[in-house]
Swiss-Prot record:
Keyword rRNA-binding: no
Superkingdom of origin: Eukaryota
Official protein name in the record: Chorion protein S36
Pfam families the record matches: Chorion_3
UniProt entry keywords in alphabetical sequence: Secreted, Signal
Function: Chorion membrane (egg shell) protein; plays a role in protecting the egg from the environment.
Gene Ontology MF term list: structural constituent of egg chorion
Main location: secreted
One cellular component term from this protein's GO annotations in UniProt: extracellular region
Length: 284
């Protein structure tokens, strides 16, 4: 008797829970559930994803937005020092007077920042779009994806080369825009001589690399289009017999030197060329 009473009490207590989950009627609750979650191609999709991931899944607009890398504490301190240096540079009257002059390479703007640039403490990059009216700029990073521009002087003509396409000369005509994203300048002291595309930001910015050759105003500086190291060939001053192998090689070398000293009018000078001795065979 008591067992049946307990079952009755539990059934009465569970009735509101079942009604709240499945609706007051089976058919109405089924239709209401489909109308709430499955009407339309994307209706209720975020709710399903949120439930499946335990509330850890980001919203669709947050997933589609570009990734912003948070700087480490060391980089934050370095960026703070760079910002302080930039503010001091902008407040300097000499920089304000010389930033658009022809003597920018020897001005205070270059000397204050060139040391950090050469030591790799500041990343120098170009804008996202490159055209013929591009100004040579120092972009000081205020964050991984944000930079402040210090425009200095015009950068005349550039040649843009993209793999699979002929080089595009950007020096006249209407403004020509070339995507170069992001572009890293390689720096010699006070001279920007080449820029190349290096994808360092983990976002789908550009799949095809674009290499840009930059000309210094009034002077063409040869630099490879692709970031490769060309081999250095050194021409020897004169050809001489290579080191002999064993006693036969030493004997042939001595015989060649003696014949050269006897037969040539140049006296004791070394012979210009001698045939190498075969392995283990006398000279022929």
């Amino acid at each position: 008797m008591q067992l049946g009473l307990w079952f009755g009490i539990l059934a009465i207590a569970a009735t509101p829970l079942v009604s709240a989950n499945y609706g007051p009627a089976g058919g109405h609750g089924h239709g209401h559930g489909h109308g709430q979650y499955l009407s339309g191609p994307n209706a209720g999709l975020e709710e399903y994803v949120n439930v499946a991931s335990g509330g850890n899944q980001q919203a669709a607009n947050q997933i589609a937005s570009q990734a912003e890398i948070q700087p480490t504490p060391e980089e934050a301190r370095r960026l703070g020092r760079v910002q302080a240096q930039l503010q001091a540079l902008n407040a300097d009257p000499n920089y304000q007077k010389l930033k658009n002059s022809e003597d920018i390479a020897e001005s205070l703007a270059e000397t204050n920042l060139a040391s950090n640039i050469r030591q790799g403490k500041i990343k120098v990059v170009s804008p996202q779009f490159v055209d013929q009216h591009l100004f040579r700029s120092l972009l000081v990073p205020s964050g991984h994806n944000n930079h402040q521009v210090i425009a200095t002087q015009p950068l005349p003509p550039i040649i843009v080369h993209q793999p699979g396409a002929p080089p595009a000369h950007v020096n006249s005509g209407p403004p020509t825009v070339v995507r170069g994203n992001p572009v890293i300048y390689k720096i010699k002291p006070s001279v920007i001589y080449q820029q190349e595309v290096i994808n360092k930001v983990p976002t789908p910015l550009s799949l095809n690399p674009v290499y840009v050759k930059v000309y210094k105003p009034g002077k063409k500086i040869e630099a490879p289009l692709a970031p490769v190291v060309a081999p250095v060939y050194s021409q020897p001053r004169e050809y001489s017999q290579p080191q002999g192998y064993g006693s036969a090689g030493a004997a042939s070398s001595a015989a060649g030197a003696a014949s050269s000293a006897d037969g040539n009018a140049y006296g004791n000078e070394a012979p210009l060329y001698n045939s190498p001795a075969p392995y283990g065979q006398p000279n022929y």
